[in-house]
C-alpha cells in the first residue's frame, strides 16, 4: 500500500496540481458532451419579444434593425471598461509568465531579472566563447562613433526645436516605387501594365507656425519595476480566512442620514467593544505606587524642614536671651563700678582683627594687580605711586621730592599766640584767603597755560597760531572799545569789595540784626527824659 493512502487529504493544492485537475475536468466535459449546444437567433417572423443580449444571439451577422434596442454585435460600440489588469500570458511550456508584471511599461529589449535562476551565477563552460571576449579597438571605436552620432542627433533636435526660427529640414532623397494597377486593360492606365512612381518629400515652410497643439501634459513614464518576488504564487484563500478578513462597515453611533435600519449585532460589531478584552496596564499600579512614595517623601521632607526651622528659631532665641543677660550683667557691673579686663582684651582683639583685615585687603589688591591686563596694571601702579604735591600742574615734575617730613615754615618763629592769626579770635570775620597763594608769575603760567611739549603731539606746531586767532570777534566794534590791549597773564584777579557789601554786612551785625535801630533807641531816650523830669 502507498504512503499517501494513510495521509489525510491536503487542504491546499499547488499550482501544478490545480492545473492538472483543470485539464482533467475539461477533458471529462468534452467526453460527456455528445451534442454541441449552439445558440442562434430565432427565424424571421418569430422574434416578437425577443431581445438580443449576448454575442451568441447575433450569430455571424450584425444587429437586428426591427428590434429597437441598443445592440452591440461583436461588442462594437460598447464602452469598454478601463482596467490596469494584465492579460495572462504563458510560456512555451504552458506556465504563467509572472514576469509580465515587472515588464509592464518597459521596453522589450530591457533585461529584467525575475527568476530564481537569475540569482545563481552561471558557470563558464567555454572560456574562448566570443560572447565572453572583450571587444577589440575597432569595435570600441565603431560603438563610440555610433553613440556620438546618436547623441548629437538628439541634442541637435532639441536645440532646433527650442529655436524660434530654424533652418529648413533637409529633404529626404527621392524614392522610386514600381506600381502595378489593379485594373489592367487598354482603356486603363494608357495601356501600361506597370508604372514607376517617384516619391518626393513635400517642401515645408520653415516660418510656418505649428499646426497642432503640443502643450498637452506628457504622461509620466513608468516607475521603476517592482522587486521580483522569488516564491511560489499565491494560493486561493479558504472560507475561514475570508471570514477572518471581513471588516465590518463603519457605522456611526450618532449619525444616520439615510435612515437605514441597522441591526444591533451589526452596530456592536462596528463598535468593536466585544472584540477585545479589557486589560489594565501594570504601569497604572506603578504610577500610583510612585505617586504615593513621592507624597510620603515630600511630607517627611516638609516635617524635617519644619523641625530644623524650629530648632534654629530656638537657638536664635536662646542666643538673643544670652546676649540680653550679658548686656544686663555688664550694665550692673558698670553701675556698681566694677572694672573688668574684658574691655581691654576686646580692644586688643579688635585692633588685631583690623590689622588682619588691612593685610588681607593688601594681599587681595596685589592679586588683582597680578591678574589685571598689562595696560590696566601699569595704570594702577602709576596711580598708586603718584605724588600729590602743592603744585597742581599736569605734566610738570615736582622738583622737591624728599623723604623728610616737611612742615610749614610760616608757623615757626611767631611772636604772637593763637589769637593773632585769626583776627583775634573772631570767627565771623572771613579773612583766611586775604593774600594770593603763590602769586608768582611762573606759577600762574604753569597752572593756567598748557605746556607746549605735551600739546605739540596733539595740535602740532600751529598751537600759538590757534591761540592768537581772534575768534568770537564782532565785525563792528562798539565805540570806545580797544581790542589791541595786552591780554592778561595768570589767573583771574578780582577787586576787593567794589560795592562796599562787606562794610554793609558788618554794620548790620553790629546793630544786633534789628530791622529798625532808630525805633528801638527812641523809647530809651523818652524814658531817660522822663526820669530827669521826675527828679526835677
Swiss-Prot record:
Region of interest called Interaction with PPIL1, as start-end residue ranges on this chain: 59-79
Subunit composition and interactions: Identified in the spliceosome C complex. Associates with U4/U6-U5 tri-small nuclear ribonucleoproteins (U4/U6-U5 tri-snRNPs). Component of the minor spliceosome, which splices U12-type introns. Interacts with SKI, SMAD2,SMAD3, RBPJ, RB1, PABPN1, MAGEA1, SIRT1, FOXN3, U2AF2, PPIL1, DAXX and ATP1B4. Interacts with VDR and RXRA; preferentially associates with VDR:RXRA heterodimers. Interacts with NCOR2. Interacts with MAML1. Interacts with NOTCH1 NICD; the interaction involves multimerized NOTCH1 NICD. Forms a complex with NOTCH1 NICD and MAML1; the association is dissociated by RBPJ.
Main location: nucleus
Protein keywords: Acetylation, Isopeptide bond, mRNA processing, mRNA splicing, Nucleus, Phosphoprotein, Spliceosome, Transcription, Transcription regulation, Ubl conjugation
CC annotations in GO: cyclin/CDK positive transcription elongation factor complex; nuclear matrix; nuclear speck; nucleus; U2-type catalytic step 2 spliceosome
Protein name: SNW domain-containing protein 1
Region (SNW) location: 174-339
PANTHER family noted in UniProt: NUCLEAR PROTEIN SKIP-RELATED
Pfam family, one: SKIP_SNW
Species in which this protein is naturally found: Bos taurus (Bovine)
InterPro entries: SKI-int_prot_SKIP, SKI-int_prot_SKIP_SNW-dom
Function as written in the Swiss-Prot or TrEMBL entry: Involved in pre-mRNA splicing as component of the spliceosome. As a component of the minor spliceosome, involved in the splicing of U12-type introns in pre-mRNAs. Required in the specific splicing of CDKN1A pre-mRNA; the function probably involves the recruitment of U2AF2 to the mRNA. May recruit PPIL1 to the spliceosome. May be involved in cyclin-D1/CCND1 mRNA stability through the SNARP complex which associates with both the 3'end of the CCND1 gene and its mRNA. Involved in transcriptional regulation.
Region of interest called Disordered, as start-end residue ranges on this chain: 1-46, 209-233, 311-386, 472-536
Superkingdom per UniProt: Eukaryota
GO molecular function, one term: Notch binding
Gene Ontology BP, a term: regulation of vitamin D receptor signaling pathway
Sites of the Glycyl lysine isopeptide (Lys-Gly) (interchain with G-Cter in SUMO2) crosslink: 23, 81, 97, 115, 122, 141, 158, 170, 193, 240, 258, 286, 339, 344, 416, 441, 452, 509
Family as reported in the entry's similarity comment: Belongs to the SNW family.
Amino acid at each position: 500500500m502507498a504512503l499517501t493512502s494513510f495521509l489525510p487529504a491536503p487542504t491546499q493544492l499547488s499550482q501544478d496540481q490545480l492545473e492538472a485537475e483543470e485539464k482533467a475536468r475539461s477533458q471529462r466535459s468534452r467526453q460527456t458532451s455528445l451534442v454541441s449546444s449552439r445558440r442562434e437567433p430565432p427565424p424571421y417572423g418569430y422574434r416578437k419579444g425577443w431581445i438580443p443580449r449576448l454575442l451568441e444571439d447575433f450569430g455571424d451577422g450584425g444587429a437586428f434593425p426591427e428590434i429597437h434596442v441598443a445592440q452591440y454585435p461583436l461588442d462594437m460600440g460598447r464602452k469598454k471598461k478601463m482596467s490596469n489588469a494584465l492579460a495572462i500570458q504563458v510560456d512555451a511550456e504552458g506556465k504563467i509568465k509572472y514576469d509580465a508584471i515587472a515588464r509592464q511599461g518597459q521596453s522589450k529589449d530591457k533585461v529584467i531579472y525575475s527568476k530564481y535562476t537569475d540569482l545563481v551565477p552561471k558557470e563558464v563552460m567555454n572560456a574562448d566563447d566570443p560572447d565572453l571576449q572583450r571587444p577589440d579597438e575597432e569595435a570600441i571605436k565603431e560603438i563610440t562613433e555610433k553613440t556620438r552620432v546618436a547623441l548629437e542627433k538628439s541634442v541637435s533636435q532639441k536645440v532646433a526645436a527650442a529655436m524660434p526660427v530654424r533652418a529648413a529640414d533637409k529633404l529626404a532623397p527621392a524614392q522610386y516605387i514600381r506600381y502595378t494597377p489593379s485594373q489592367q486593360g487598354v482603356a486603363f492606365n494608357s495601356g501600361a501594365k506597370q508604372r514607376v512612381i517617384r516619391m518626393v518629400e513635400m517642401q515645408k515652410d520653415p516660418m510656418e507656425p505649428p499646426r497642432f497643439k503640443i502643450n498637452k501634459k506628457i504622461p509620466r513614464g513608468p516607475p521603476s519595476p517592482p522587486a521580483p518576488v522569488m516564491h511560489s504564487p499565491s494560493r486561493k484563500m479558504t472560507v475561514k480566512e475570508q471570514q477572518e478578513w471581513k471588516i465590518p462597515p463603519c457605522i456611526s453611533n450618532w449619525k444616520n442620514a439615510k435612515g437605514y435600519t441597522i441591526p444591533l449585532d451589526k452596530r456592536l460589531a462596528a463598535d468593536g467593544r466585544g472584540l477585545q478584552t479589557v486589560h489594565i496596564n501594570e504601569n497604572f499600579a506603578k504610577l500610583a505606587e510612585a505617586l504615593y512614595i513621592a507624597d510620603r517623601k515630600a511630607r517627611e521632607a516638609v516635617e524635617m524642614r519644619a523641625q530644623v526651622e524650629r530648632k534654629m528659631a530656638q537657638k536664635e532665641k536662646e542666643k538673643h536671651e544670652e546676649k540680653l543677660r550679658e548686656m544686663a550683667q555688664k550694665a550692673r557691673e558698670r553701675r556698681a563700678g566694677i572694672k573688668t579686663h574684658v574691655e581691654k582684651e576686646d580692644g586688643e582683639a579688635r585692633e588685631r582683627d583690623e590689622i588682619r583685615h588691612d593685610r588681607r585687603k593688601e594681599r587681595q589688591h596685589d592679586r588683582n594687580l597680578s591678574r589685571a591686563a598689562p595696560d590696566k596694571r601699569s595704570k594702577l601702579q602709576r596711580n598708586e605711586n603718584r605724588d600729590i604735591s602743592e603744585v597742581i600742574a599736569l605734566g610738570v615734575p615736582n622738583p622737591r621730592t624728599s623723604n623728610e617730613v616737611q612742615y610749614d615754615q610760616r608757623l615757626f618763629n611767631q611772636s604772637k599766640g593763637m589769637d593773632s592769626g585769626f583776627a583775634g579770635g573772631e570767627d565771623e570775620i572771613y579773612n583766611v584767603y586775604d593774600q594770593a597763594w603763590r602769586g608768582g608769575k611762573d606759577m600762574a603760567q604753569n597752572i593756567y597755560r598748557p605746556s607746549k611739549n605735551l600739546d605739540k603731539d596733539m595740535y602740532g606746531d600751529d598751537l600759538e597760531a590757534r591761540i592768537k586767532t581772534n575768534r568770537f570777534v564782532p565785525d563792528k566794534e562798539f565805540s570806545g572799545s580797544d581790542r589791541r590791549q595786552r591780554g592778561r597773564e595768570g589767573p583771574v584777579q578780582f577787586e576787593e569789595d567794589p560795592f562796599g557789601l562787606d562794610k554793609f554786612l558788618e554794620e548790620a551785625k553790629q546793630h544786633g540784626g534789628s530791622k529798625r535801630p532808630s525805633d528801638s533807641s527812641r523809647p530809651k531816650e523818652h524814658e531817660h527824659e522822663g526820669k530827669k523830669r521826675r527828679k526835677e
